[in-house]
């Protein structure tokens, strides 16, 4: 932990080199997308996308699971999504699963989670797709994790304020899958119902 503390203590010196960029952030935010992904420490949205401060509104949960929409049971997840869409006017929502996901692995294997009851109960929200997930023994559990992403996309569609915007053509949903061992980002292509690598295009330089 100490290296992290030391870095945080010196971070102010780095912002001093870019005072205008950071001062602008005080004026408000207009993020390009809501990025929903797992809490896994190996998945870093700004690293994957090259996003600078202010460009991504993030929601991270164990296993990038979203709870069912329930107006009687407000959740942090629903509040974050609602704020992104209704207040910030975000027009793109990414759900990004990943390889080697502990949560999806536990679901696929049917692990005994008695010792972590909050995790056990949270994973009941996972709602796998009707076509099921495959416990094929692959340590990367890619098939299961990709199916899991699509299940969360379906769940998002059940959030009424999202459904309204989707119907009006004002919102786009993106299902992504990140391979943590290769750095490859795959995107779901509905016509083929498969995840494929993003075609290479010129990109801007990553933030320093
Ligand atoms: Zn995960």
Indicate where each model-derived feature is located:
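N-terminal-biased segments
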Residues: 1, 33-37, 41-43
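Short beta-strand segments
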Residues: 36-38, 60, 94-98, 174-179
């Amino acid at each position: 932990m100490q290296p992290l503390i030391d870095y945080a203590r010196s971070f102010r010196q780095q912002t001093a080199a870019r005072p205008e960029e950071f001062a602008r952030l005080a004026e408000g935010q207009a993020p390009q997308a809501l990025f929903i992904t797992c809490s896994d420490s190996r998945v870093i949205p700004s690293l994957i996308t090259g996003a600078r401060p202010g460009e991504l509104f993030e929601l991270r949960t164990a296993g990038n699971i979203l709870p069912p929409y329930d107006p009687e049971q407000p959740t942090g997840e629903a509040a974050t999504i609602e704020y992104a869409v209704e207040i910030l006017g975000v027009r793109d929502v990414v759900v990004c699963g990943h390889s080697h996901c502990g949560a999806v692995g536990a679901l696929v294997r049917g692990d005994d989670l008695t010792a972590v009851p909050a995790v056990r109960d949270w994973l009941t929200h996972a709602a796998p797709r009707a076509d099921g997930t495959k416990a094929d023994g692959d340590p990367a559990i890619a098939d299961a994790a990709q199916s899991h992403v699509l299940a969360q996309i379906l769940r998002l569609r059940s959030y009424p304020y999202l459904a309204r915007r989707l119907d009006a053509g004002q919102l786009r949903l993106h299902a992504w899958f990140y391979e943590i061992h290769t750095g490859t980002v795959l995107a779901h292509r509905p016509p083929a119902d498969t995840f494929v690598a993003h075609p290479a295009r010129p990109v801007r330089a990553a933030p320093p």
